[in-house]
Amino acid sequence: MFPLAKNALSRLRVQSIQQAVARQIHQKRAPDFHDKYGNAVLASGATFCVAVWVYMATQIGIEWNPSPVGRVTPKEWREQ
């Protein structure tokens, strides 16, 4: 008896899920904020971040730890 009841319940669940999916497919939903402005917000945020990094890297005057090769001369070795 248990397998029969289990099978009946699983079929009921599957049918209810299928009905819910069918209702959602046929239902016309209005576009939300992300549908309307999602790509524009993403593009403007990426542009802003790139602009800030470019400004910071070129205009602020941060010393970016360049290589000392060719600019540093070694001192003479002193033996004691």
Curated annotation (Swiss-Prot):
Q: Tell me the superkingdom of the source.
A: Eukaryota
Which SUPFAM superfamilies does the UniProt record give? Answer: Mitochondrial cytochrome c oxidase subunit VIIb (SSF81423)
The record's listing under InterPro entries reads:
Cyt_c_oxidase_suVIIB, Cyt_c_oxidase_suVIIB_dom_sf
Q: Identify the keywords attached in UniProt to this record, alphabetized.
A: Membrane, Mitochondrion, Mitochondrion inner membrane, Transit peptide, Transmembrane, Transmembrane helix
Which pathway?
A: Energy metabolism; oxidative phosphorylation
Q: Which residues lie on this side of the membrane: Mitochondrial matrix?
A: 25-32
Q: List locations, semicolon-separated.
A: Mitochondrion inner membrane
Record has Transit peptide as a keyword? yes
Give any Gene Ontology cellular component. Answer: mitochondrion
Q: Which GO terms describe its biological process?
A: central nervous system development; mitochondrial electron transport, cytochrome c to oxygen
The record describes its membrane topology as: Single-pass membrane protein
The UniProt transmembrane annotation reads 33-59
Kindly give the Pfam families that the UniProt entry links to this protein: COX7B (PF05392)
Disulphide-bridged cysteine pairs = none
> Transit peptide from where to where?
1-24
Residue intervals annotated with topology Mitochondrial intermembrane = 60-80
UniProt function note: Component of the cytochrome c oxidase, the last enzyme in the mitochondrial electron transport chain which drives oxidative phosphorylation. The respiratory chain contains 3 multisubunit complexes succinate dehydrogenase (complex II, CII), ubiquinol-cytochrome c oxidoreductase (cytochrome b-c1 complex, complex III, CIII) and cytochrome c oxidase (complex IV, CIV), that cooperate to transfer electrons derived from NADH and succinate to molecular oxygen, creating an electrochemical gradient over the inner membrane that drives transmembrane transport and the ATP synthase.
What is the annotated quaternary arrangement, including any partners? Component of the cytochrome c oxidase (complex IV, CIV), a multisubunit enzyme composed of 14 subunits. The complex is composed of a catalytic core of 3 subunits MT-CO1, MT-CO2 and MT-CO3, encoded in the mitochondrial DNA, and 11 supernumerary subunits COX4I1 (or COX4I2), COX5A, COX5B, COX6A2 (or COX6A1), COX6B1 (or COX6B2), COX6C, COX7A1 (or COX7A2), COX7B, COX7C, COX8B and NDUFA4, which are encoded in the nuclear genome.
Which family does this protein fall into? Belongs to the cytochrome c oxidase VIIb family.
The record's section on PANTHER family has: CYTOCHROME C OXIDASE SUBUNIT 7B, MITOCHONDRIAL (PTHR16716:SF0)
Q: Which named protein is this?
A: Cytochrome c oxidase subunit 7B, mitochondrial
> What are the top taxonomic ranks of the organism?
Eukaryota, Metazoa, Chordata, Craniata, Vertebrata
